[in-house]
Design a protein with these regions (language model features):
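N-terminal, positively charged/glycine-rich alpha-helical extensions of SAM-dependent methyltransferases
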Residues: 1-10
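Signature of N6-adenine DNA methyltransferases within the class I
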Residues: 13-14, 18-29, 46-57, 65-83, ...
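Glycine-rich helix-loop-beta junction characteristic of Rossmann-like nucleotide cofactor-binding loops
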Residues: 30-37
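Nucleotide donor/acceptor-binding cores
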Residues: 39-40, 69
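Conserved beta-strand elements of the Class I
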Residues: 41-43, 264
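C-terminal substrate-recognition regions of SAM-dependent nucleic acid methyltransferases
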Residues: 177-326, 334-339, 349-360, 370, ...
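Short, amphipathic C-terminal "tail helix"
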Residues: 385-390
Length: 390
């Protein structure tokens, strides 16, 4: 079979065409067993070269019967559609019903969808969100892999609202460092499994793995699931034992003033860590805040240099940078501390400066030792809290 992408790199980016890896296609296809009634019609609305649809057919008790009677494929690009049909003929000796239509414009009479929608933007819109919204409106259940950006931001409110109409909703989130799902695209992606069987809401945090451990990561996917906190405003990405830190109580912003003697400077370009300094850093990207008094300054210094802020950013935001909105929304925690730990942090921010060149200029940051971060975590986070700095 031919699963070679016919597009060059520029065409891939322009058209948002990234084919589903075979191992991820299997992950998605197996989740269909959760809600497939054995009778309904499945559609792959943007089948590409057929990896997803062929995998879905392959796991059936009678793949040929499934292809002939329960599968529909669609591909707007006729060149890719012809390759897919050839792949089906080679694999099963038969081809499914097929269309060369615009999925968003054409009415398909189907029950379920499995898809990897295009990732490109048109004007200010993410096309993949329209695919999700149509799937929500026309199916009893669907499985999709798409960018993680739908989890927050006002422009995706409608998408999240439609997803919430499904009583069962499970979402797996994948980071793009150090390993990545698509070898030819460095994008954070999510697998959404939405259906009407049972009532369950589950999610993962943004899963990270080293490329050499990809197989074990996939095999242990469900161990990362926790009870989900999904709202129209945000779909939180939570690991087990962290949901309790999401609450509607006091936020960091409740302890800030317009100006004071207690400033903090927070780097806004996180990769593996976020730090807050009592002094301005020699870097382009940082957020300046003023705490209202000495006690709130010290607690903020501890919280913002622990794993907590980094976890919050990964949990509620899908941006590549830390926004002031996300920073100020950090749930506030009151706890006891000793002034000695404050002195340790202030000393560490002087001794553990690191520099990375960006846009021709060295950007200063602070990388506290793991032991210090662990000590800060222990002051107000439970023992099982995810070790995000490992």
């Amino acid at each position: 079979m031919n699963f070679t992408n016919p597009y060059n790199d520029d065409e891939k980016k322009e058209n948002g065409v990234y084919y589903t890896p075979e191992d991820i296609s299997l992950v998605m296809s197996l989740r269909s067993k959760l809600f497939d009634d054995g009778k309904g019609i499945w559609l792959d609305p943007c089948c590409g070269l057929g990896v997803l649809a062929i995998t879905l057919a392959s796991i059936q008790d009678d793949p040929v019967e499934f292809v002939q009677n329960r599968l529909v494929i669609n591909e707007k690009d006729e060149r890719q559609l012809n390759i897919t049909l050839s792949n089906f003929q080679e694999k099963f000796g038969v081809v499914p019903r097929h269309f060369n239509e615009d999925f968003l414009e054409y009415d398909f009479n189907i029950d379920y969808i499995i898809m990897n929608p295009p990732y490109f933007q048109y004007k200010d819109s993410d096309i993949y969100a329209y695919f999700i919204e149509k799937a929500c409106k026309t199916t009893k259940g669907f499985i999709t892999i798409n960018p993680t950006s739908f989890t927050n931001g006002t422009k995706f409110n409608k998408t999240r609202r439609l997803l919430l109409e499904y009583p069962s909703l499970t979402i797996y989130h994948f980071d793009n460092i150090p390993g990545k799902i698509f070898e030819d695209a460095k994008v954070r992606v999510s697998i959404i499994v939405a259906h009407q069987v049972g009532e369950e809401r589950k999610t993962t945090g943004q899963i990270r793995w080293k490329s050499k451990l990809r197989k074990s990561m996939i095999e242990s996917l469900d161990t990362n699931l926790s009870d989900a906190v999904f709202t129209e405003k945000v779909f939180f990405k939570t690991f087990p034992n962290t949901v309790q830190y999401i609450h509607d109580g006091e936020k960091l912003e409740d302890y800030l003033v317009s100006e004071s003697d207690f400033p903090l400077f927070v780097s806004n370009s996180p990769r593996y860590f976020i730090s807050a300094s009592s002094q301005i850093m020699d870097r382009n990207g940082q957020i300046k805040i003023y705490l209202k008094d000495s006690d709130s300054f010290k607690k903020a210094l501890i919280m913002l240099n622990s794993s907590y802020l980094y976890w919050w950013w990964k949990t509620c935001d899908s941006s590549l940078s830390l926004t002031k909105k996300t920073l100020l929304s950090l749930p506030w925690i009151n706890f006891e501390y000793d002034d000695n730990i404050i002195n340790v942090i202030l000393h560490s921010e002087q001794m553990n400066k690191v520099y990375k060149k960006n846009a021709g200029k060295l950007q200063e940051n602070i990388k506290h030792p793991k032991e210090l971060i662990s000590n800060l975590n222990s002051l107000f986070l439970h023992d099982g809290f995810i070790k995000l700095h490992d």
